[in-house]
Amino acid sequence: MNKEYKILDNGFLKLIDFMGDDRRIVKAARISYREESVKRKDAELIDYLIRNGHTSPLEQVVFTFHVKAPIFVARQWMRHRTARINEVSGCYSLAREEFYVPLEEDLKCQTSSNSSEKEFKSLEKLSDKIKHHQKHSYELYQDMINANIPKELSRIVLPLSLYTEWYWQIDLNNLFHFIKLRLALDSPKEIKENSPKEMREYAKALISIVREIVPIAFNSFENHFLRGKRFSHEEIIAIINALDLNKLSMDAEKLNLLKDKLGID
């Protein structure tokens, strides 16, 4: 805890506090049965819960993070409405002159066929224009502040690349969902390519933190959801017809789980 993960040029992610771990998930699950009829070992129980979508025990584990990111990242982040957020207020505090400037290779990566390649002779020139725009915007912001214009109105001239900070509290189940959506590992190629690189960097840092606190739960989540795939009924039928499942190198229990998932008696 208190380790600060440096992200982008001026951003960071830091775990402030957490409540619960793998043991809390197990205890929350077993209380439903008064610990009488659940014979599974702890790791097996957690895997069962995650695999079958029994998520309420995961909600017993809660994290609080301190995040610093550009406003355009923050607004995407806050689309996840299952968390509690306290953000730096532009009404009560002065904005700092801290802006995100993408690396030139990232500008090139995100450049489409009909973008401004013809207008700008080089990515270096484009990067310089971004910095100039940011500097000019902040100077205008300061002019408005010095003219005694209220902070909440003066900030309208600041770009989305301005850094903001917030405290973010979220339970493990919804954190897993956040990571899955933002990494887009199981998404079609087109969605992966359009997934914001900046958001993925924060999601990777979240993984580094969560993996240390709930290693058993994270391994199950990674296996079933982060790197797992969903199949349509049509695809399942095609798989069944193409494979001799009994020849798969899986132990009997996992093979039976696979057959059950595919609807094979």
Swiss-Prot record:
This is Flavin-dependent thymidylate synthase. Binds 4 FAD per tetramer. Each FAD binding site is formed by three monomers. Residues 11-224 form the ThyX domain. GO terms for molecular function: flavin adenine dinucleotide binding; NADPH binding; thymidylate synthase (FAD) activity; thymidylate synthase activity. Gene3D superfamilies: 3.30.1360.170. Keywords: FAD, Flavoprotein, Methyltransferase, NADP, Nucleotide biosynthesis, Plasmid, Transferase. The active site is at R182 (involved in ionization of n3 of dump, leading to its activation). SUPFAM superfamilies: Thymidylate synthase-complementing protein Thy1. FAD binds at S56, R79, H80, R81, E87, D171, L172, N173, H177. One of its GO terms (biological process) is dTMP biosynthetic process. Belongs to the thymidylate synthase ThyX family. Its EC number is 2.1.1.148. DUMP binds at Q76, W77, M78, R79, R155, R182. It is an enzyme of class 2 (transferase). Disulfide bonds: none annotated. Homotetramer. CDD domains: ThyX. Catalyzes the reductive methylation of 2'-deoxyuridine-5'-monophosphate (dUMP) to 2'-deoxythymidine-5'-monophosphate (dTMP) while utilizing 5,10-methylenetetrahydrofolate (mTHF) as the methyl donor, and NADPH and FADH(2) as the reductant. A motif (ThyX motif) lies at residues 79-89. It catalyses: dUMP + (6R)-5,10-methylene-5,6,7,8-tetrahydrofolate + NADPH + H(+) = dTMP + (6S)-5,6,7,8-tetrahydrofolate + NADP(+). The gene is thyX. The keyword Methyltransferase applies. Pathway: Pyrimidine metabolism; dTTP biosynthesis. Its cofactor is FAD.
